[in-house]
């Protein structure tokens, strides 16, 4: 009998692994080409004839913070299908649990804290046992019901420079346990295939109430209430197994604190022991090393994935993009560029977005380029930059300076060049594709390098020698360009020729 069952068991196990591996690969793997996207296009005819820099036009004050809204009714936001919000969370401020109809990327501009995305069906892996002393032994049923004092899903520490990925419909909260305000920029992709509602950001509150950001255009201010307020008290009480009084508390009918509330004595949360010990001892440097080590931990035991290594419940939801050691390209005289995509941040396969952080030194340039498969939402975090954007007709649709706190939407395929000013420049670009690609015009691995000399000579009516210089003036520079004059370009080229 055992000899008959052994093949059946083996076949069943193989089938289980195959099915689960295929599912995980579909959810987290590269199910689509880098050139493709599950994103919906805009249903309206869009004309990006004149781009503009954006700043928040409306702020809503909560008890322990502020939510700042950009003008998402503007055609540029409507056509690209993105929504942008900036939040300031004061020390001991708690952003109440909520979820959104679109996938989001969050960049931490300043501060540190804790966040807790809650994935459905995942276990409460953080557990704290009761400390019982001097009490009689409990019965089995009592022991089971009181086995843990608290249990919840994994919480994640974040710090300045982190990018946090939030899939559509996944509830999350955020708490500032630092000494300075947390400042974060939220970019939500509403044309993402995960959103089957209209292309307008809808925040579903699990607690608290907030003022409607569109209310400033109306005479009567509206308030958004949490989802429990729409249920009857009796039905809610029965469904959750609580008293009517508790059910009314969940509805937060008279709660005027807003979406960011103050926790007077701080949150008591379950955290890894080493992190707590470092906080108590005040060893900042040690804490940073610990956190960085946490960020660098990979779920993969080797360089490849079989689809089972990283699933919903073990997804890394944040990655630091400011760490210089993570830079993909670096020029010591110009700056660095760091990319986050599905290759180094697998959860982006669910979010269907990616991010690029650019740090340019004094007067450095970024190679002219265009985005092949994504729109780009550029947010300046430091300094100033001169930016020019050109459309398909060769018309300049933006020619101006971007400063800290401003935002610019660059449509797909529009050519752009950026030059840092005297104080340098740093910005983060949110892309509407999980594996965004750009095509550089100059420098190494660029369009000019790829074209034959005769093609360039005849296209621009220049000599073959000038075409050769055009291809190689920038030497092996890629991405960030050193700020030098044209005469120096010739010197670089002549030196290369003589060698």
Swiss-Prot record:
MF term (GO), any: nutrient reservoir activity
Cystine crosslinks: 46-79, 122-313
Region forming the signal peptide: 1-24
A biological process from GO: seed development
Keywords, ordered alphabetically: Disulfide bond, Seed storage protein, Signal, Storage protein
Domain of life the protein comes from: Eukaryota
Annotated Pfam families: Cupin_1
PROSITE patterns assigned: 11S_SEED_STORAGE (PS00305)
This protein's record includes keyword Signal: yes
Keyword Disulfide bond attached: yes
Domain Cupin type-1: 51-248, 319-468
SMART domains: Cupin_1
Chain's role: Seed storage protein.
Family in the record: Belongs to the 11S seed storage protein (globulins) family.
Assembly and binders: Hexamer; each subunit is composed of an acidic and a basic chain derived from a single precursor and linked by a disulfide bond.
Entry protein name: Glutelin type-A 1
Gene: GLUA1
């Amino acid at each position: 009998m055992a000899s008959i069952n052994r093949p059946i068991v083996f076949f069943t196990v193989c089938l289980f692994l195959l099915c689960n591996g295929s599912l995980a690969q579909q959810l987290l793997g590269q199910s689509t080409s880098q050139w493709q996207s599950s994103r919906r296009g805009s249903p309206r005819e869009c004309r990006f004839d004149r781009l503009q820099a954006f700043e928040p036009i409306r702020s809503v004050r909560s008890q322990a913070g502020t939510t700042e809204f950009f003008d998402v009714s503007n055609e540029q936001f409507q056509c690209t299908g993105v929504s942008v919000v900036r939040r300031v969370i004061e020390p001991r401020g708690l952003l109440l649990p909520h979820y959104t109809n679109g996938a989001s990327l969050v960049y931490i501009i300043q501060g540190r804290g804790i966040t807790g995305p809650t994935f459905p069906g995942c276990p409460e892996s953080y557990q704290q046992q009761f400390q019982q002393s001097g009490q009689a032994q409990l019965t089995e049923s009592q022991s089971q019901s009181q086995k843990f004092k608290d249990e919840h899903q994994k919480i994640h520490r974040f710090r300045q420079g982190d990018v946090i990925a939030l899939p559509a419909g996944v509830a999350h909260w955020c708490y500032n346990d630092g000494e300075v305000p947390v400042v974060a920029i939220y970019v939500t992709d509403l044309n993402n295939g995960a959103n089957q509602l209209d292309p307008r950001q809808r925040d579903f509150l699990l607690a608290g109430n907030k003022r409607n950001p569109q209310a400033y255009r109306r005479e009567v201010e509206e308030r958004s209430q949490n989802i429990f307020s729409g249920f009857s008290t009796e039905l809610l009480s029965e469904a959750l197994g609580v008293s009517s009084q508790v059910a009314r508390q969940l509805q937060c009918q008279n709660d005027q604190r807003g979406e960011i509330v103050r926790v007077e004595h701080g949150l008591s949360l379950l955290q890894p022991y080493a992190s707590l010990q470092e906080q108590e001892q005040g060893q900042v440097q040690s804490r940073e090393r610990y956190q960085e080590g946490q960020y660098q931990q990979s779920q993969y035991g080797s360089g490849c994935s079989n689809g089972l290594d990283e699933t919903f419940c073990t997804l890394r939801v944040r990655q630091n993009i400011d760490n210089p050691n993570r830079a993909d390209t670096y020029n010591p005289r110009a700056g660095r560029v760091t990319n986050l995509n599905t290759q180094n941040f697998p959860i982006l396969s669910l979010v269907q977005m990616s991010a690029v952080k650019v740090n340019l030194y004094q007067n450095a340039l970024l190679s002219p380029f265009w985005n092949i498969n994504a729109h780009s939402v550029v947010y300046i975090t430091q300094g100033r930059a001169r930016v020019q954007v050109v459309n398909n007709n060769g018309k300049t649709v933006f020619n101006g300076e971007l400063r800290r706190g401003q935002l610019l939407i660059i449509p797909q395929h529009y050519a752009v060049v950026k030059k840092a000013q005297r104080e340098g420049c740093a910005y983060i670009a949110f892309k509407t594709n999980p594996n965004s690609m750009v095509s550089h015009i100059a420098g190494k691995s660029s369009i000019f390098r790829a074209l034959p000399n005769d093609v360039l000579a005849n296209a621009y009516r220049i000599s073959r020698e000038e075409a050769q210089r055009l291809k190689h003036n920038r030497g092996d520079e890629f991405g960030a360009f050193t700020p030098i004059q044209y005469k120096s370009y010739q010197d670089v080229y002549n030196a290369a020729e003589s060698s």
